[in-house]
Amino acid sequence: MHLEIPEDYGIVNMVSIDPGSNTCGMAVYELDTSTRTINSIMAFTIHVEKLNDNSGLHLDLATDRFVKILKLCNVIKNIIESTNARIVVSEAPFFNKLMPMAYGSLLEIVSSINRTVHETGNEIIFTSYAPQQVKMSLSAAGIKGKDVIKEKLMEVPEVYSKIVGDYDLLDEHSIDAIAVGYTFLVQRCGKKVWK
């Protein structure tokens, strides 16, 4: 399946994800493909520990991490279904030499999200972008700092002006999820195409 967004397809919803085993940033974009307009972006963070465990698994039969991933994937599936999302974009796992064990966990989470998306529907586009690609889409490659992504998104009016709620109240996970979705739009359509 190609990853292009069809023109004149009407309203399409996209879910973008900043994956994590404890906190997972989510953003839901409403896109109008006829006018290439971002109608709205709703962003939030899922705190996995606070989710109900409906897996039916006993902790002595499954690891805590496995149960957390199941809980997270169930919520992601519900979000995809309730928004009728046609596109799901995730940040890809990355290797950090200061935290090498985190790579395996992220890989497991993103693989589980990928499987969940495809179990939800074959017509759903799924792709992922490395953190470096996300930073490059915001012209932030090589710039270090905790609030770099937050500040760079404020410089993109076609995104910043469409965020529902108070931007200053969003945490880094939900902000990163917004940036991941923006990366998809830039990679597939180019900068300044969406308004």
What are these regions (language model features)?
Residues 1-195:
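Phosphate- and other anionic-substrate recognition elements at nucleic-acid/protein interfaces
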